[in-house]
Amino acid sequence: MKILVMNCGSSSLKYQLLDMENNKVLAKGLAERIGINDSLLTHQAEGKEKVKIQRDMKNHKEAIQLVLEVLVDKEIGVIKDMKEIDAVGHRVVHGGEYFTDSVLIDDEVIKKLEDCIDLAPLHNPANIEGIKACQQIMPGVPMVAVFDTAFHQTMPDYAYIYPIPYEYYEKHRIRRYGFHGTSHKYVSMRAAEILGRPIEELKIVTCHLGNGASITAVKNGKSIDTSMGFTPLEGLAMGTRSGSIDPSIVTFLMEKEGLTAHQVVDILNKKSGVYGISGISNDFRDIENAAFNEGNKRAMLALKVFAYIAKKTIGAYAAAMGGVDAIVFTAGVGENGPEMREFILEGLEFLGFTLDKEKNRVRGKEAIISTEDSRVKVMVIPTNEEYMIAKDTEKLVKGIK
């Protein structure tokens, strides 16, 4: 079975074509600047050079048409006919309380996704546009929605309810939802496989640390708490997001700086985090370079703040689960940042591990980076959200065939 996985952002489209018979990625790529001038498609077929194609893409439909064109192209394509695509798996950011698992898409599902637009105004409209465009271009091909929020729907009510008047939850569904669910689910399952133990008996803290960052407590295979909340702005300090701060800072800044609420939230989303503290960049590599090689104090402070909040969260989740068997690092910084991993883990040894500094040098590869005799295993597991989306899609489509 060949499955096309799509991840539509507001002006971008990431895709992978996977052959599920042998779990191979046949091709992958990225369409950028959709609806803006200078649109660009970067495409790479397995075993071939990367190809860059500049062509105007006014909307997601035109981008998807171009993607399908290159997939069947004689020179750079990997399939002879569009009909070889058995199903399409769509990443959807917010499924609200409607979806606890991936679903086959029909009109009813689309209606519910539209109901969730208020909860994810930046992401859901693009996700829906991508789904509708695919339905038009590929009628009859099964489509599946895989949600960032679904994995966290197993959280108990005391973990997701905010201590504000309960009527706001009833009226507006204000609660913790959590994100990066597909990634947390994949790395927790993979950790159990590597450890050779059933996930149903493990307590795992998964750390998805990239430009967006979140940590999840996975107990017996289920998410019981996660650091992102009603939106992806809560929790850890991130590339440009503040993470959790005192809410009254919003009104204080509005008064002192003459800003609207919308402007303050924009600052908290786009100008804060390690970028806000360092004043350099939202890229951890730039900040680490400034901190370690140039002695930049604010860059070092940004790294320390990021590591400190992550450290506290790992400790809190070990407490919430009544212990921990494994701590897993994934995503850009988690997979490729030995220094940051060491920063975060320093002082957490009381949980039952010793970091092996030699093994911790690993970048972008699966590894156990704690010492052999550590009771708690510390692991690096590169995330593979596309594979997870394809797996869920395959499972649902096989169910209807």
From Swiss-Prot:
Q: Where in the cell is it found?
A: Cytoplasm
Co-factor binding details: Mg(2+). Can also accept Mn(2+).
Q: Name one GO cellular component term.
A: cytoplasm
Q: Where does ATP bind?
A: K14, H208, L209, G210, N211, G212, D283, F284, R285, G332, V333, G334, E335, N336
GO MF, any single term: ATP binding
Names of the cofactor(s): Mg(2+); Mn(2+)
Name the UniProt record assigns to this protein:
Acetate kinase
Active-site residue list:
D148 (proton donor/acceptor)
Asked whether the UniProt record includes Acyltransferase among its keywords, one would answer no
Q: Where does Mg(2+) bind?
A: N7, E385
Instruction: Output the GO biological process annotations, alphabetical, semicolon-separated.
Output: acetate metabolic process; acetyl-CoA biosynthetic process
- What top-level class of enzyme does the UniProt entry assign? transferase
> Per its UniProt record, what Gene3D superfamilies does this chain match?
3.30.420.40
Q: What is its EC number?
A: 2.7.2.1
Record keywords: ATP-binding, Cytoplasm, Kinase, Magnesium, Metal-binding, Nucleotide-binding, Transferase
